[in-house]
């Protein structure tokens, strides 16, 4: 496993999101947003999208579809030590999730998973940077570790700036 050091400074935060999804209005606390994306702490209303995301990544054998442990897995996402965020386009379309592992360390790790139809569109570097800037504003860190888990992800992270922005 390889890690890249990525350095960031300040970000935006503190808005509330209201959007129409499937004819239903949702009010969500926004962790950070810009003119393209909205990042919110994951919530119960994200469960179906999150499960589908993991089905796309892991196939039908994902633990989120396993009758014996799906509720336990979801509880871990909501209440675990890692912070999980849902990523939306500004129009409210769900893109995927971001995970901040070891959030209290000086070197937190950021992971990202996107729906198949949202991959290879330049979303990952933008939302990872957006999340990192906001996290840095909350608490100064030495650097963020970006985990590369798939060959496809390599292109996403190799294009990342490795200097201070």
Regions found by a protein language model. Give the residues of each.
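Conserved GNAT-fold acetyl-CoA-binding loop/helix
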Residues: 55-76
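A short helix-loop-beta-strand connector motif used in the catalytic cores of GNAT acetyltransferases and
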Residues: 75-87, 96
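Short amphipathic alpha-helical patches
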Residues: 73-78, 155-159
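Acyl-donor (CoA/ACP) binding surface of acyl/acetyltransferases
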Residues: 7-14, 18, 23-49, 53, ...
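Amphipathic alpha-helical interaction segments
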Residues: 12-16, 58, 72, 82, ...
